[in-house]
From Swiss-Prot:
Its EC number is 5.3.1.5. Keywords: Carbohydrate metabolism, Cytoplasm, Isomerase, Magnesium, Metal-binding, Xylose metabolism. Homotetramer. One of its GO terms (cellular component) is cytoplasm. SUPFAM superfamilies: Xylose isomerase-like. The active site is at H100, D103. This is Xylose isomerase. Belongs to the xylose isomerase family. Pfam families: AP_endonuc_2. Mg(2+) 1 binds at E231, E267, D295, D338. It comes from Rhizobium etli (strain CIAT 652). The keyword Isomerase applies.
Length: 436
């Protein structure tokens, strides 16, 4: 049943690359076969509940610009928001969505009331999922907006805040499991510091490790089959965040013995804030065996903060999905649009148009990446570059069968005098441009 919020807009359909209809897909075809698999099953698109339905359009210099009929902190408004959200998912044909607890329920007076409100809306979501076929990609807890978390959640100097946060995460994992969610995400927006003058780094990192182990233990206790994901970000809102980037997260996971239990949800905008490219973080996560899922968006490269815009750069998407595909593709993860409208984009149709453009951009990137893989456009030059390591002697060297003394003797006796070879960066950049 239509809520009327989107007027007479009908379900978004594919019309082909020559279409000028802003409410149609030009490149995204869910059933198109790419590398032997449906495009929808490769991309696994999800809509972010928070940016799409709860963001008021404010910025540091101005308040709310969006006037949504559900912008009240009541259960009635929460259910109206859910009605509009699931209508949106159906219009867009999005197979998944993601949420924080605070996005979907009204704020209660205490933990018990928060839990009651969450359970009520989860039951409502279950009905909506059954009616529409939309599924939950992942759930998470908002442990950063409420003032109780201003000094952190897991890393808070007050153990009562730690306990409140841990109990909240339990309820959110329960909700995620009840709704058939395929992952559970931890993002430590306040797990960091503003100044070292009042921060015990070792204590806070140890607290964070204990918190993470509690989550992993509870996952196994209840038989949750999904993946636990950490989302790296270097800063914002804190000056320095402990889950800075993929490399930092991996070191943290290793220290606390959960590197085989937890993977990463990588956001393009966060990679940029950390001084990396998106594909760097994806490639590193693959190399370390912790790639899980992605939050798809882009940052304004001039702004210096997290602008969460919809992706529109096909070459960037092609390289991103190249690494996703090269790593075997998504297992339980997917492509969550952690992106929001600009505050002047007031029309309900703008919500659809932003997602349509992002989905088309990702589809073009996916197809370009798939073609590069089929043609071995990058993998063959890479194999050629490292071919020397495939020899028997080089394999022994790699496996550690020679000591430094033996290596030195071998270099001297064989008069080893290697000469450099071209890295062919310009050629490879031109190769990529042929596909995009």
């Amino acid at each position: 049943m239509s809520t009327g919020f989107f007027g007479d807009i009908q379900k978004i359909k594919y019309e082909g690359p020559d279409s000028t209809n802003p409410l149609a897909f030009r490149h995204y075809q869910p059933d198109e076969i790419v590398l032997g698999k449906r495009m929808e099953d490769h991309l696994r698109f999800a809509v972010a509940y928070w940016h799409t339905f709860t963001w008021p359009g404010g910025d540091p210099f101005g308040g709310q610009t969006f006037l949504r009929p559900w912008f009240e902190d009541t259960m009635k408004a929460a259910k109206l928001k859910a009605d509009v959200a699931f209508e949106f998912f159906s219009l867009l044909g999005a197979p998944y969505y993601c949420f924080h607890d605070a996005d979907v329920r009204p704020e209660g007076r205490n933990f018990a009331e928060n839990t009651k409100n969450l359970n009520e809306i989860v039951d409502y979501f279950a009905e909506k999922q059954a009616a529409t076929g939309t599924k939950l990609l992942w759930g998470t807890a908002n442990l950063f907006s409420n003032r109780r978390y201003m000094s952190g959640a897991a890393t808070n100097p007050d153990p009562d805040v730690f306990a409140f946060a841990a109990a909240t995460v339990k309820t959110c994992i329960d909700a995620t499991q009840k709704l058939g969610g395929e992952n559970y995400v931890l993002w430590g927006g306040r797990e960091g510091y503003e100044t070292l003058l009042n921060t015990d780094l070792k204590r806070e990192l140890d607290q964070l490790g204990r918190f993470l182990n509690l989550v992993v233990e509870y996952k196994h206790k209840i038989g949750f089959k999904g993946t636990i994901l950490i989302e790296p970000k270097p800063q914002e809102p804190t000056k320095h965040q402990y889950d800075y980037d993929v490399a930092t997260v991996y070191g943290f996971l290793k220290k606390h013995g959960v590197e085989n239990e937890v993977k990463v949800n990588i956001e393009q905008g966060h990679a940029i804030l950390a001084g990396h490219s998106f594909e760097h973080e994806l490639a590193l996560a693959n190399a370390l065996g912790i790639f899980g899922s992605i939050d798809m968006n882009r940052n304004d490269y001039q702004s210096g903060w997290d602008t969460d815009q919809f992706p529109n750069n096909v070459p960037e998407m092609a390289l991103a999905y190249y690494h996703v595909l090269a790593g075997g593709g998504f297992k339980t993860g997917g492509t969550n649009f952690d992106a929001k409208l600009r505050r002047q984009s007031l029309d309900p149709a703008d919500l659809l148009i932003g997602h349509i453009g992002g989905m088309d951009c990702c589809a073009r990137g996916l197809k370009a990446a798939a073609k590069m893989i089929e043609d071995k456009a990058l993998s063959q030059p890479l194999a050629d570059r490292y071919a020397g390591w495939e020899s028997a002697e080089a394999q022994k060297l790699f496996r550690g069968e020679y000591s430094l003394d033996e290596i030195t003797n071998w270099v001297e006796s064989h008069d080893v005098n290697p000469q450099p070879k071209s890295g062919k960066q310009e050629l490879l950049e031109n190769v990529v441009n042929r596909y995009v």
